């Protein structure tokens, strides 16, 4: 079978905050898929970057008395440290504030402009007279023009849900200076999205999106596509629009181009062919993993920009839902707005990887991290089932058989049943239905433990050491099959299991033959149980984080 060439991206985390468990849902989802593709022998690259531009970055650095470059450098280092400990295996993690991104953004802009897809017009915006800067909607607060609710942002009311322009807000104030904004005219640059309506509809019909996403896009088409403002006025931290003084690319223009820039950096470092992956007639595969809150940008603007600049479009966009904790939106006051670092200070990252896999499917439903179920699921499935197979079998092999597996002929049909299940597990991984894959694997783990229970090696050892040798050797081989299937989800535990089994990296193809007359190493615990105390410590530490921020 010919190896596939695949490029995978995840949404870029913004460089003004820390990674939290909501972010990690997507990176773990994508990482599992990438690891699976590599196990299948496919050439698969996974790129990402910090999203570094925009008014919030400029203002935050100003508040801290440092340059934006210094701010984003420190944030990137922390982001990458968190990702590394959660085993997110990026081929390249870059920054949107890079020469590659600047060059590609300018190139795309010139192509769009030359083709007549960039328009200009004068617009009126809210302007802070004290800070001498135009204000994004989220930097203005006031009273809702419809229901009168206080302290509402400049784009929509969180109380009654109405949307409006900042100029309609009553008693409006700049959240930067507390000054009353004034209206000021400015020339802005627009991407003419409506020109691509026919092409976008055709692209969507080709099946690049989940059905739920396609249905949502149909609603937007019915409302009518609008030209997209791709410019912002100085002062602004970002890339200046070529040949236009005092105008910068809006962050949402150069952010998705950051996917291309990150891959370009990887290509330059490893001698890969960038054009092979992004030329209009490319035969490679391109997949974006994103959350449902940024579908509009990725399923309309982004493909249209690629079409207009003569690049290939995504093979598919994989959309996931939001993360809730204990059935509710993450809350700082309840201690359920959990940062990655807070989790890492108390719990094993592989536990979260498994729980997310147990919950994730190809649908865009929200995922709930129920902390009680999280503890019970990890303790039951990983510790009580999978690891238990190895731990309860190894002692006999160490004490009686010099840690060497038998050349057994006992119950070969059970081993082959485990191997045959690999086909359906592969299909579930490929389709991103990890929840179904985990359930299949745990059914097998139950069978392995049932097999040990039925043969009772602790009793057999008194009268039939040969059968004990065969039973425990088969159990170890069943454990090997399960860990091969779990490797995309649990890479660290899989590595430890490889060392215990004294083998090279787990490989689906190697499962055709069981290990016989093979010496293993001393067993060391692969996973510890989650205790209530640890979860309580995470919640309490998250509450403390809120107080520090406040």
Swiss-Prot record:
InterPro entries: aa-tRNA-synth_I_CS, Anticodon_Met, Met-tRNA_ligase_1, Met-tRNA_synth, Methionyl/Leucyl_tRNA_Synth, MetRS_core, MetRS_Zn, Rossmann-like_a/b/a_fold. Pfam families: Anticodon_3, tRNA-synt_1g. One of its GO terms (cellular component) is cytosol. This is Methionine--tRNA ligase. One of its GO terms (biological process) is methionyl-tRNA aminoacylation. Monomer. Zn(2+) binds at residues 144, 147, 157, 160. One of its GO terms (molecular function) is metal ion binding. The keyword Aminoacyl-tRNA synthetase applies. It comes from the Bacteria. ATP binds at residue 332.
